[in-house]
Regions:
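Nucleotide-activated sugar donor-binding and catalytic core shared by glycosyltransferases
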Residues: 1-218, 223-359
């Protein structure tokens, strides 16, 4: 969302943009926003230790609803499939305020996979007045659901805007210092907690053991359950680095340094192909099939044998690796935020410079 906020604020003489955080994963969010010179204008501070998803949702809804009542915005914008976006859409709907959904139309068509993200984005799509799907495939999903074509605008993904801007930050050091190949593992999705995540970690460990030149780097999610499992399986190995979540520019540089990525992250599925990096997707389904169709990503699920087989194939077969590494990214050209800005202001009756459509 940061590139969208920056783009809207280029025209701050025409409209005020208020950046709101619910306060989830505050340290990670603030570090990411600082990359773009941003801080939240409002932090609702909803997080409490040990609270349930229902409690997070309730507190976020109360906070956003109160803020909408106080500030009376002309439009609420939410991005992606988070609980915050779901709640923002619901609060805007209750207040009869228009809602715009950035990264709209992603679907697995399985309501609880990923959980709760598939539900979150479907609800956001139900109430949205403006839909900004990143690709034509996502736009087709919206059309099949009966959304009005005149409210759907394909923009490319704003995450590509962010990753390309961060990659241009030449002051960020390359990481890590390792002469051999680097493999990146990111795993945090709720549906992978427990046994699936253990299988993922064991598969990654086996790949490190098979290939003596490989260093595995694992940024650890703040959730204690995730961290404890990763440490129990992967801790103590000289060629495995368990690290705190890096600041966004460092994470981008880390991706650029890698040879291969194993991830259950939706964002990483989109970002890695921008650098020609193969991604093994640690999920059974994906709402981002464009990368799979383009050859930049492969679904491997959470089966240990399948992860090891596909990882070893890419690390051991140069031709197989080249086929995935040379595929073209289908997710954007770095101008998605400008397209969002143009359509948002158009919706509000304000004229700003147009941008060539993304196809």
């Amino acid at each position: 969302m940061a590139p969208v906020v920056l783009e809207l604020r280029r025209f701050e003489d025409l409209a005020e943009t208020l950046l709101v955080s619910t306060g989830q994963h505050d340290a990670i969010l603030l570090a990411a926003l600082s990359t773009f010179g941003l801080t939240p204008d409002v932090d609702l501070g909803i997080m409490r230790h040990g609270q349930s998803l229902a409690q997070v949702t309730t507190r976020a809804l109360d906070g956003i609803a109160s803020l909408i009542e106080e500030r009376k915005p002309s439009l609420v914008i939410g991005q992606g499939d988070t609980t915050t976006t779901f709640v923002a859409a619901l609060a805007a709907f209750y207040a009869r305020v228009p809602f715009a959904h950035v990264e709209a139309g992603l679907r697995t068509n399985t309501i609880d996979n990923p959980f709760p993200e598939e539900f979150n984005r479907r609800v956001a799509g139900l109430v949205a007045d403006l839909h900004f799907p990143p690709t034509s495939w996502a736009a087709d999903n919206l059309l099949k659901e009966g959304k009005e074509p005149e409210r759907i605008f394909v923009t490319g993904n704003t995450g590509i805007d962010a990753v390309l801007e961060a990659a241009e930050n030449t002051q960020t050091p390359w990481y890590p210092d390792h002469e051999g190949r680097v493999v990146l593992l990111t795993t945090h999705r709720r549906e992978n907690w427990g046994d699936p995540q253990r299988r993922i970690a064991e598969a990654a460990l086996e790949l490190v053991q098979r290939f003596p030149d490989v260093l595995l780097v694992v940024p650890m999610h703040p959730n204690p359950q995730v961290r404890e499992l990763l440490v129990s399986v992967l801790g103590g190995h000289e060629r495995i680095q368990l690290i705190e979540p890096p600041e966004y520019p460092n994470f981008v540089k880390l991706m650029q340094r890698c040879k291969l990525i194993l991830s259950d992250s939706g964002g990483v599925q989109e970002e890695a192909p921008a650098f020609g990096l193969p991604v093994l997707v640690l999920r059974d389904t994906t709402e981002r099939p464009e990368g799979v169709h383009a050859g930049t990503a492969k679904l491997v699920g959470t089966d240990k044998r399948e992860i090891v087989e596909q990882g070893a194939r890419l690390l051991g077969d140069p031709e197989a690796y080249r086929e995935m590494a040379q595929a073209v990214s289908p997710y954007g050209d770095g101008h998605a935020s400008a397209r969002v800005r143009y359509r948002v202001f158009e919706f509000l009756g304000i004229e700003t410079p147009s941008v060539e459509d993304w196809n």
